[in-house]
Amino acid sequence: MSDNSQKKVIVGMSGGVDSSVSAYLLQQQGYQVAGLFMKNWEEDDDEEYCSAATDLADAQAVCDKLGMELHTVNFAAEYWDNVFELFLAEYKAGRTPNPDILCNKEIKFKAFLEFAAEDLGADYIATGHYVRRQDVDGKSRLLRGLDGNKDQSYFLYTLSHEQIAQSLFPVGELEKPEVRRIAEQLDLVTAKKKDSTGICFIGERKFRDFLGRYLPAQPGPIMTVDGQLVGKHQGLMYHTLGQRKGLGIGGTKEGGDDPWYVVDKDLDSNTLLVAQGHEHPRLMSVGLVAQQLHWVDRQPVTAPFRCVVKTRYRQQDIPCTVTPLDDERVDVRFDDPVAAVTPGQSAVFYQGEICLGGGIIEQRYPLTNPA
């Protein structure tokens, strides 16, 4: 008998392939496994309702196939209060938040973890995230997933070592093609299902239309960094630094046909600033200040240290020096300038495979100060 046979694991079943295979792998490891489908959004239209109903049906079909129970829970109120309202407030303030990080912090590894432990008697929860856990000296570390293309540690940096100690990540040890292969061998309904993109639980939809339901559009001018009016935007909230598509402006006689990129947002004048070329000096930063820090080991940083940072998901590692400003903020200086560092997004720090933690980008240090 496996030592795991007395341990109960609740898997967050999303109706996708990663959580499906996670449940199977845990069964193979000898755990008592059940699923939990979380409903975190009250749908507004038929299309959304259909998508959520399909996900639930797929999760149920997988659980039936694997011979395990599926529980359901509604966290829509928690999601609205702790994720969505903050998400809207950030957009209103001209920043670009990452709702998936908030959702993991408030829902998947808080509300779900508490519900699984208290209501379902779970010893552990499990998710289909591509990350790994390593236990060293009685503390759990968060490691990058084995599949570098799929590593999701960027989204989980807010977790504490205590939360990680109660969590299992079976597919973090595998590469994505292997996960699909296992699902196909088991003839799971999710084997060929497309990976979900879009906002956490809100799903795939036209982002501009969605945001427009909750925040009124505030049109304003699009200006070049040289002060030339080149167009009109429908609202600063629809744009993010480094964005190229959806600006509705072509080349100019002076600038030729190089594409335009968003390089700044002036909230006071409701102006979107653009420049041509993805390495325009105004788009580059030499560092940043991060706030709302979360360190996985929960030890405050007291001295400068070297590491690498990511300022967005799937970005190349950026070598940097991190210096504490106070308990809540750090100063980060890159070895080389970096494009499109975006306030509101997260800066996540690593040493080798270990995810140390991270924070929200409060401000960036531009390569060139505006005249």
UniProtKB/Swiss-Prot annotation:
<dbReference type="Pfam" id="PF03054">
    <property type="entry name" value="tRNA_Me_trans"/>
</dbReference>
<keyword id="KW-0547">Nucleotide-binding</keyword>
<feature type="active site" description="Nucleophile">
    <location>
        <position position="103"/>
    </location>
</feature>
<dbReference type="InterPro" id="IPR046884">
    <property type="entry name" value="MnmA-like_central"/>
</dbReference>
<dbReference type="InterPro" id="IPR014729">
    <property type="entry name" value="Rossmann-like_a/b/a_fold"/>
</dbReference>
<dbReference type="GO" id="GO:0005524">
    <property type="term" value="F:ATP binding"/>
</dbReference>
<keyword id="KW-1015">Disulfide bond</keyword>
<feature type="site" description="Interaction with tRNA">
    <location>
        <position position="345"/>
    </location>
</feature>
<feature type="site" description="Interaction with tRNA">
    <location>
        <position position="129"/>
    </location>
</feature>
<feature type="region of interest" description="Interaction with target base in tRNA">
    <location>
        <begin position="98"/>
        <end position="100"/>
    </location>
</feature>
<feature type="binding site">
    <location>
        <begin position="12"/>
        <end position="19"/>
    </location>
    <ligand>
        <name>ATP</name>
    </ligand>
</feature>
<keyword id="KW-0067">ATP-binding</keyword>
<dbReference type="Pfam" id="PF20258">
    <property type="entry name" value="tRNA_Me_trans_C"/>
</dbReference>
<protein>
    <recommendedName>
        <fullName>tRNA-specific 2-thiouridylase MnmA</fullName>
        <ecNumber>2.8.1.13</ecNumber>
    </recommendedName>
</protein>
<feature type="active site" description="Cysteine persulfide intermediate">
    <location>
        <position position="200"/>
    </location>
</feature>
<comment type="function">
    <text>Catalyzes the 2-thiolation of uridine at the wobble position (U34) of tRNA(Lys), tRNA(Glu) and tRNA(Gln), leading to the formation of s(2)U34, the first step of tRNA-mnm(5)s(2)U34 synthesis. Sulfur is provided by IscS, via a sulfur-relay system. Binds ATP and its substrate tRNAs.</text>
</comment>
<keyword id="KW-0808">Transferase</keyword>
<feature type="region of interest" description="Interaction with tRNA">
    <location>
        <begin position="312"/>
        <end position="313"/>
    </location>
</feature>
<dbReference type="InterPro" id="IPR004506">
    <property type="entry name" value="MnmA-like"/>
</dbReference>
<dbReference type="InterPro" id="IPR046885">
    <property type="entry name" value="MnmA-like_C"/>
</dbReference>
<comment type="similarity">
    <text>Belongs to the MnmA/TRMU family.</text>
</comment>
<keyword id="KW-0963">Cytoplasm</keyword>
<keyword id="KW-0820">tRNA-binding</keyword>
<keyword id="KW-0819">tRNA processing</keyword>
<dbReference type="Pfam" id="PF20259">
    <property type="entry name" value="tRNA_Me_trans_M"/>
</dbReference>
<dbReference type="GO" id="GO:0002143">
    <property type="term" value="P:tRNA wobble position uridine thiolation"/>
</dbReference>
<feature type="binding site">
    <location>
        <position position="38"/>
    </location>
    <ligand>
        <name>ATP</name>
    </ligand>
</feature>
<dbReference type="InterPro" id="IPR023382">
    <property type="entry name" value="MnmA-like_central_sf"/>
</dbReference>
<comment type="subunit">
    <text>Interacts with TusE.</text>
</comment>
<feature type="binding site">
    <location>
        <position position="128"/>
    </location>
    <ligand>
        <name>ATP</name>
    </ligand>
</feature>
<dbReference type="GO" id="GO:0103016">
    <property type="term" value="F:tRNA-uridine 2-sulfurtransferase activity"/>
</dbReference>
<keyword id="KW-0694">RNA-binding</keyword>
<feature type="disulfide bond" description="Alternate">
    <location>
        <begin position="103"/>
        <end position="200"/>
    </location>
</feature>
<feature type="region of interest" description="Interaction with tRNA">
    <location>
        <begin position="150"/>
        <end position="152"/>
    </location>
</feature>
<dbReference type="GO" id="GO:0005737">
    <property type="term" value="C:cytoplasm"/>
</dbReference>
<dbReference type="GO" id="GO:0000049">
    <property type="term" value="F:tRNA binding"/>
</dbReference>
